[in-house]
A protein has these predicted regions:
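Extended, surface-exposed interaction regions
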Residues: 1-53, 89-92
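Contiguous, low-complexity intrinsically disordered segments that are highly enriched
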Residues: 45, 49-92
Length: 92
């Protein structure tokens, strides 16, 4: 879960109530990324290919939701939100 700890550090400056919303979503994204990597490494079966597609779509939905929330937060916590947006954009 090194990736989760990395993402978690980017939102550390945000208020606790916002972190409480984002942390479960970030955990889900990291889990989806790990599964995506497993399926990328072995996409030999139709099941793996279907799972890969489903998790990729889930990841994109989560990223869109987080970005929307962070754009709304930018007015108050510009630097932390900008940093997380930049990191999330690397994985699109």
């Amino acid at each position: 879960m090194e990736r989760f700890e990395e993402l978690k550090s980017y939102i550390a400056a945000l208020p606790d109530d916002i972190q409480a919303i984002l942390l479960p979503v970030l955990r889900d994204i990291v889990y989806a990324e790990e599964l995506l990597q497993k399926f990328r490494d072995n996409p030999k079966t139709k099941t793996n290919a279907a799972m890969f597609k489903a998790y990729r779509q889930t990841k994109q939905i989560y990223q869109t939701d987080i970005k929307t929330l962070l754009w709304q937060l930018r007015q108050n916590e510009t630097s932390a939100a900008d940093e997380l947006l930049k990191k999330l954009s690397e994985f699109e």
